[in-house]
A protein has these predicted regions:
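Glycine/proline-rich, positively charged
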Residues: 234, 238-276
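Short, surface-exposed, polar/charged, turn-prone segments marking secondary-structure boundaries
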Residues: 51-54, 227-231, 254-255, 279, ...
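Secondary-structure boundary elements
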Residues: 17-19, 247-252, 277-285
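Catalytic PLP-binding core of fold-type I/II PLP enzymes
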Residues: 65-69, 84-86, 256-258, 268-287
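Conserved N-terminal alpha-helix of the aminotransferase class I/II PLP-enzyme fold
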Residues: 1-199, 203-243
Length: 287
């Protein structure tokens, strides 16, 4: 994976839906991007977290055990029988996930689906570096990346081209960006509208990845549901959003709309001014 956290999240997601306990063990420091409190509160995942002095002796556990280690070299790993998943963090490339034994083979397809729906596996450049490391371990000290410099250049170019001071955000793929936005919106809604249900409004004919991803998020959180938005046939976005927002207002829920405009040619907006009016309209809850 190009990500250090996604392989952990993929296992946590499957175990949440299967009601399986998860133990996350680590021997060094956790990556700064792994915020245990946020993962529990926003994603709804359940797990125990513990640091080990040594990975030589790991006690048994009623559930799945994830062992995290920092490995810049790609060596053969002798997995402890009490470890179900081994995740090796690489400083420049991301992470490598090893699945232990036959008892966990049914996790593989679910983990692969996370790579299709929530993120990417690995960029072509990183994949090439990883293959080189498999052939020659000495290359671990020669991998040079300028990710931060490249990001700065891209962000500056976006501001220059668009003529705005708004902070741009970039991601390795559209779905990974959308996933980050969705979880960020859930976090924001929980902080600013605590204890209120959340409704993601999704066009019924939008791209399969978008629809599937939204439903995968909702499947993990009891207070999040998907509301279908009819936008084709005799329906247009303005009329449909007006009806949907009235319904969500009666539920006193937080509406979040995934629009896909203008990338989806089937989503029609006849009049932008009326769309603005519908989005700005004050609505009344049932109480």
């Amino acid at each position: 994976f190009s990500s250090k956290t996604i392989p952990i999240l993929a296992i946590l997601r499957k175990n949440l839906l299967a009601d399986i306990n998860t133990r996350v063990l680590y021997t060094q420091d956790l990556p700064s991007c792994f915020d245990a409190d946020t993962i529990r509160s926003v994603y709804g995942y359940r797990f125990e977290l513990a640091q080990l002095d040594s990975a030589d002796s790991i006690p048994p556990f009623d559930g799945s055990t994830i062992l995290i280690s920092h490995e810049d070299e790609m060596n053969a790993i002798d997995l402890d029988p009490n470890v179900d998943f081994y995740i090796g963090f690489h400083s420049d490339l991301g992470s490598i996930l090893l699945v232990n034994e036959e008892r966990n083979k049914d996790y593989v397809s679910d983990i692969q689906h996370v790579r299709r729906r929530e993120t990417i596996a690995m960029t072509p450049a990183n994949a090439l570096d990883a293959l080189k490391l498999l052939v020659d371990k000495s290359l671990v000290h020669t991998i040079k990346t300028n990710v931060q410099g490249n990001k700065t250049s891209v962000l500056n170019s976006l501001k220059e081209i668009t003529g705005t001071e708004t902070k741009p955000l970039v991601a390795s793929s559209g779905l990974s960006m959308q996933y980050a936005i969705m979880m960020g919106l859930i976090d924001d809604a929980q902080q600013n509208h605590p204890n209120k249900p959340i409704r993601f409004v999704v066009p019924t004919n939008c791209y399969g990845g978008t629809n599937d991803q939204a439903r995968r998020v909702a499947a993990c959180l009891d207070h999040v549901e998907i509301v279908d938005l009819a936008v084709d046939g005799d329906n247009d976005m303005v009329q449909s959003i007006d009806k949907v927002l009235d319904k969500i207002a009666l539920e006193d829920a937080v509406p979040l709309i995934i629009a896909e405009i203008p990338t989806n040619p089937r989503v029609e907006v006849p009049e932008l001014v009326k769309l603005k009016e519908v989005l700005c309209k004050q609505r009344i809850t049932a109480s």
